[in-house]
């Protein structure tokens, strides 16, 4: 998983920042359960950016996951599952002075199709989103991922969903894409909830 650092606006933006995942391989679904329109630019329902990461929850199984990045630095993310299916992943914020992870929510990766923002969720058709919201910015990053930015909410789309040659962009610098063309069945693969600055 490629990650980049982004500032965390949780009341003291000088002290903390959140890692920003650029892709995820987890795809979760719970079938035909009713959707919950609880994604906002502040968090996912009761889970808010800047709040303490809970150790337990009555509705979810919680599992910390340790990974090592390209620079051999350990990072811990926290998976929230229901009935054995990962629903979302919490990324702790970082403390600038020590570069250590805090126990506060820095960002949330939604991988379940059960949560939406204004009706848009994992599995939503990308072309329908852009048609209904023509002013949303589309960016391309690192030959892997397109992002549709909507304030503190970013819809992530695999580059395989793009129709035509991929845009040329500087390495590791998100670049705006003018008049993007996605395949008819292009879908949102995950949703990243993050601080805005």
Task: Give the predicted meaning of each segment.
Residues 9-142, 151, 174-197:
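Short helix/turn-capping signatures at newly exposed starts of structured segments
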Residues 139-166:
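Short aromatic loop motif centered on NTY/YTY
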Residues 4-7:
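C-terminal motif of bacterial Sec signal peptides marking the signal peptidase cleavage site
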Residues 165-173:
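Charged C-terminal helix
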């Amino acid at each position: 998983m490629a990650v980049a650092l982004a500032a965390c606006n949780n009341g003291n933006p000088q002290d903390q920042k959140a890692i920003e995942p650029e892709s995820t391989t987890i795809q979760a679904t719970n079938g035909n359960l009713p959707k919950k329109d609880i994604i906002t630019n502040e968090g996912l329902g009761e889970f808010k950016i800047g709040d303490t990461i809970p150790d337990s929850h009555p509705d979810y199984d919680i599992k910390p996951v340790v990974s090592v990045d390209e620079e051999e630095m350990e990072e811990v993310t926290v998976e929230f599952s229901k009935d054995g299916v990962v629903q979302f992943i919490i990324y702790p914020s970082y403390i600038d002075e020590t570069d250590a992870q805090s126990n506060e929510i820095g960002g949330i990766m939604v991988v379940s199709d059960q949560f939406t923002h204004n009706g848009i969720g994992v599995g939503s058709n990308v072309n329908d989103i852009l048609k209904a919201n023509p002013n949303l910015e589309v960016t391309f990053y690192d030959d892997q991922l397109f992002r549709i930015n909507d304030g503190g909410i970013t819809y992530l789309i695999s580059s395989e969903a793009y129709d035509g040659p991929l845009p040329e962009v500087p390495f590791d610098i998100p670049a705006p894409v003018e008049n993007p063309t996605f395949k008819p069945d292009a879908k949102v693969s995950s949703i990243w909830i993050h601080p805005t600055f």
